[in-house]
Amino acid sequence: MIRALILLVAALFVTAAREPVLVPDVSQRNIDIVYSFTGAELLLFGAILYPDGRFPQRDADIAVVLKGPSQPILVREKQRLLGTIWANAAQARFQSAPSFYAVATSRPLEKLIDERTSAIYELGLGNIQLSPADAGSPDKQARFENGLVNLRRKTDLFIDQPGSVEITNGVLYRVRLPIPARVPTGHYTAETFLIRDGRILAAA
């Protein structure tokens, strides 16, 4: 049976008439996953349309986020016993966590926007919205959230690619994102953000 990974481009256009507009696209909207699937590469590209066709005096930056379907997850903490023996210790459940998350930017994210804006738009591995199912202390929650992010980074299910978005002539952009072999099937969403002077000018 062929299972399909389906990509949806989010429609989050900024409605202000005097603001620029992003026109995004992807190289393929369906990726067939069969037993021999070893991974793929997805090209995300698009154009920046400025009001009246006027180019700005200063170039803007681009951030692209690709997210997989959300899923519940249980994270266990290992504890060493008697030297080489490991056992499960504490654990934490998350009601919702993205099964895949990749972020790519034209420059390092911390140089583009502040932490508050990054958190609002869920930009960056440290700002992925997780929904803990268990009540616990803030320290415990932060520890398990960091553990989940680190685990998924090691398996290439969480990806951070600063400086990988190419912008040509200030209006055309493109970036290639890897799709690992163990990526889960389902609906994926791509979002693109236009950033300048610490502000999100447009999103699509």
Model region roles, listed by residue range:
Residues 7-18:
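Hydrophobic h-region of N-terminal signal peptides that target proteins for export
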Residues 19-36:
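N-terminal edge beta-strand
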Residues 71-72, 109-112, 195-201:
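Short acidic/polar inter-strand loop motif in beta-rich domains
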Residues 182-204:
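Extended, hydrophilic extramembrane loops/domains of integral membrane proteins
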